[in-house]
Amino acid sequence: MLEHLSSLPTQMDYKGQKLAEQMFQGIILFSAIVGFIYGYLAEQFGWTVYIVMAGFAFSCLLTLPPWPIYRRHPLKWLPVQDSSTEDKKPGERKVKRHAKNN
């Protein structure tokens, strides 16, 4: 059963993370406003809490799993380059010198 879980994608790109954060905050804010208004009109603070908790659960369901909508802009990594500085002796390396500010 665990091999099925390891095949699931777990990454989100940066734009997907931003979208997920905006959606999460928007849903929480909307549910808080609706919950406050309904709780005020019904004169029941419990309904306010229930509506906010339902909004939180709904936003978690929409934003925590890495849905395909959050993976539309994958990162393009640079190819691996051989570092030739490891092969050089200390005397052969270029020394970087910084200009002194007066």
Swiss-Prot record:
May be phosphorylated. The keyword Membrane applies. It is a multi-pass membrane protein. One of its GO terms (biological process) is protein targeting to ER. InterPro entries: Spc1/SPCS1. Component of the signal peptidase complex paralog A (SPC-A) composed of a catalytic subunit SEC11A and three accessory subunits SPCS1, SPCS2 and SPCS3. Component of the signal peptidase complex paralog C (SPC-C) composed of a catalytic subunit SEC11C and three accessory subunits SPCS1, SPCS2 and SPCS3. Within the complex, interacts with SPCS2 and SPCS3. The complex induces a local thinning of the ER membrane which is used to measure the length of the signal peptide (SP) h-region of protein substrates. This ensures the selectivity of the complex towards h-regions shorter than 18-20 amino acids. It is found in: Endoplasmic reticulum membrane. Residues 43-46 are lumenal. One of its GO terms (cellular component) is signal peptidase complex. Belongs to the SPCS1 family. Its main location: endoplasmic reticulum. This is Signal peptidase complex subunit 1. PANTHER family: MICROSOMAL SIGNAL PEPTIDASE 12 KDA SUBUNIT, SIGNAL PEPTIDASE COMPLEX SUBUNIT 1. It comes from Bos taurus (Bovine). Keywords: Endoplasmic reticulum, Membrane, Transmembrane, Transmembrane helix. Component of the signal peptidase complex (SPC) which catalyzes the cleavage of N-terminal signal sequences from nascent proteins as they are translocated into the lumen of the endoplasmic reticulum. Dispensable for SPC enzymatic activity. It comes from the Eukaryota. Residues 1-19, 70-102 are cytoplasmic. It holds the Pfam family SPC12.
